[in-house]
Structure formats: C-alpha cells, structure tokens
C-alpha cells in the first residue's frame, strides 16, 4: 500500500502515519518529493485499514497497489507527469527534442554543436563528458574538463545540459557544474547504489533501458530513484539486444504505449543508439513520435566524419534541421506540438 500525503501535510502528520504503519508491524518507506511525500507500507497489508489511514490528517489518499513498482505506477497518479527543465516541458502535449554530440571533444566543437542545436530549434543539449565504452582502449571522455567545456558552450546559447553519470562519486561534480538533467546509461540501469544516490538529488533523471532489460525490471529501476525522493524521472527506450545483427539494437516501439499504460512518467526514445547508423535516425525518430514518445535523444555532430566516438550514428546540423521539420508535421497530425 502507498499513502500519498497532501502537499500541505506537516512533518507531524507524516510521522503520525509512519507510526500507524509501524504499529501494525509493517515497515514504512518514506519518499519525500518536491510536491508531495509518498509513504510505502511494506509487509502484510491486511493489517492496515485503508479508510482509517485516509481519515488521518494530511493524507490525500491510500491505495493498494498490486504491482511491485508503486511510486512510478499510474494506479495512484492517473494524470501524466510533466517535468519542467528550465521552462522546457517533457510530458503532456509538448514533444521535446534533445540533441548534441556523443562526446565532448574540444571547446570549438562544443560551441559549433550548441549553435547548431539552437539553430535547429532544439531546446536541450546532450553531450558525454564521462563515456562508458565497450572497449577499454577507445575514447573514455574528457571528464571534468569536458563538463566545463559543455557547460560553457551550452550557457552561451541558453541551453540546459543533459549528460551521463557513471559513478556516484561524480555526483558532487555534477552538482558543482549544475547539470540540468542526469542521464543513467543502459549499463547502469541496474546499478542500484547509483540509482539510490540519484534519488536523493533534486535533478531530473533520464533512465535508459538496459539492453536486455524487461519492462518490469526497467520500472523497478525507476522505483529505486523514486523511493529516494526524486520523482522527476524520464524513461528512455534506446533499443534492446536480440538475435538480429544487421543493425546495432532493435528499437522496441511497443515499449512506448506499454509504459504509457503502466506509468505516469514521461517516455522518450534514443533513435541513434537503437539503429547505430545515421541513415536510420530519421525513420526511427518518426516512428517513435508517431507511437506517442514524449521526446527524442538524437546524436548530432558538427562534422560526423571527425567525431571521436559513435561517428556512424551521428547526423549533421542540416539533417537535424530537416528532421525537426518532419517531426513537427507528425506532431501536428497526432494533436501534439514541437515548439
């Protein structure tokens, strides 16, 4: 069972609910979000009186949720959650595109990329300062130096930044450089200690699907973040590993409506990692938006032929402009918009 406290609930009222739960022999898991506090009652729920709990001061509602994920479940939060990133909304009627290079390379490259992102009408910029790579011999990212370059280039164009966190020890550095959105990559989706730490900060999180993760495993990973108090979670489908070897991954478009049914949180898609080739990006992007995705994470490099990593899947600035035009047309047809 979860008990949702009202936004005006006092600390005394929250403690009163916790006491009631513990008196019945259950454990109380308290998740303190920005808007409200959610208390999960863990144990034999038959000992709890739902009506009695709902009558307590400060309680908005109490719900029996059968599924293993509670806070991220749509059962208690029927309306879609809309996440505000410096005035840029993810979720709701607006579709948000996030674009930029795979890796932060040089100040000049990042300045060109930021200008190209802005010129295409994209409102958020992505870029990797710390890079998890399959081979230990490939470029691993610029680290803190890269974060400095990224922040400086994006600030010149007024763009919020999205970058991947690989290690909880880097979190203080991310806070220092005021990273606007933390990305948890596919390899870290079940790094539960990292998820717990990210759950403690007031920064939106993009949670990428593990390359072999089921929908339930993905939702449970998000529950780790939400249980820590951070409810600003964005799911990102980036393709799953199957028997097919012609392309990099298989984009699971079916996951979009399934997640929309199971959770109130926004769902975006990474078409670049799904196909692994630049020529696939536009088609996969169109499919994702048509299927109901709330946004896209698209790799764009000022000069893909010179990219230090993932050159094959990066589109160029002109292709990004064309893609944005196509996506606006699709968004209009399905009653949504890309500003």
Which residues are covered by each model-predicted region?
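Catalytic beta/alpha-barrel core
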Residues: 6, 142, 159-169, 180-191, ...
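Alpha-helix-loop-beta-strand connector modules within alpha/beta enzyme cores
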Residues: 139-163, 197-204, 253-267, 313-336
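Glycine-rich, proline-tolerant flexible connector loops at the mouths of alpha/beta enzymes
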Residues: 126-144, 301-312
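Catalytic alpha/beta core domains of metabolic enzymes, predominantly
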Residues: 85, 201-300
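Non-catalytic terminal accessory/regulatory regions of metabolic enzymes
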Residues: 1-97
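Active-site-adjacent beta->alpha loops and helix N-cap segments on the catalytic face
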Residues: 74-79, 135-149, 168-172, 186-202, ...
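Conserved, mostly hydrophobic/aromatic
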Residues: 53, 100, 125, 174, ...
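Active-site mouth loops of central-metabolism enzymes
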Residues: 8, 95-112, 136-141, 160-165, ...
